[in-house]
A protein has these predicted regions:
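Active-site-proximal alpha-helix that buttresses catalytic centers in soluble enzyme cores
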Residues: 20-110, 115-121, 161-187
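N-terminal export signals
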Residues: 2-17
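Generic beta-sheet signal
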Residues: 31-33, 144-150
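Short, surface-exposed amphipathic charged segments that create phosphate/polyanion-binding patches used
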Residues: 121-130
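Membrane-proximal amphipathic alpha-helices
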Residues: 133-136
Length: 189
């Protein structure tokens, strides 16, 4: 069952996850990460057989709705006074485009750890290890939050949560191998 509270969607909350509608509060947690699944794409699942990293013509890309949603996410975060210390993205075009549309004035850091490993791409174990190690470092050292634009499979493996396109999970490393889910948001919808 989906309940709407302002700008937040609460879906399948695990026990112990706070549900108050405060993205600002969640991201104030030192070392927090906003794990955002790329915005809405054209129809399809995965990527075409002739997929090549770095060649957007061979990938499933953002739809016009997705492009508008990414811009709206960025404007909403700005309106809330939330500016990430860094923005990292999967190297897939749909993720890079989501990040660039959200944060046109920030440097976007492509990061292999956020790449999809669906359909046999990448190295799931190595990528998850990199992401978990970086999140643990951020929890120890970072006073701010980062935005990581990635894919459903990565977010699910890191948090145990499923996200729709354009939906985000606010999380923080809880030990070396796990993420504590702070909350989830569907953005300005």
């Amino acid at each position: 069952m989906l309940a709407r509270l302002g700008h937040l969607s609460l879906l399948a909350w695990p026990l112990g996850v706070r549900s108050e509608p405060s993205l600002r509060q969640w991201l104030a947690s030192p070392g927090a990460v906003l794990l955002l699944r790329h915005a809405q794409t054209v129809s399809g699942l995965g990527d075409p057989e002739h997929f090549r990293l770095g060649d957007c013509t061979t990938q499933r890309n953002l739809s016009q709705e997705g492009r508008a949603d990414a811009r709206a996410w960025g404007a909403w975060l700005t309106e809330l006074g939330l500016r990430p210390t860094a923005v990292r993205s999967s190297q897939w075009c749909r993720c890079l485009d989501t990040a660039r549309l959200m944060f046109p004035d920030q440097t976007i850091q492509p990061w292999v750890a956020l790449n999809s490993y669906f359909q046999g791409h990448g190295d799931r174990a190595a990528q998850l290890r990199m992401a978990r190690m970086e999140a643990a470092r951020l929890a120890r050292e970072s006073p701010g939050f980062e935005v990581w634009v990635t894919h459903q499979v990565v977010i699910t493996d890191l948090t145990g949560q499923y996200t729709a396109m354009g939906e985000a999970i606010a999380a923080r490393a809880s030990g070396a191998q796990t993420f504590a889910v702070l909350g989830r948001s569907s953005g300005p919808r």
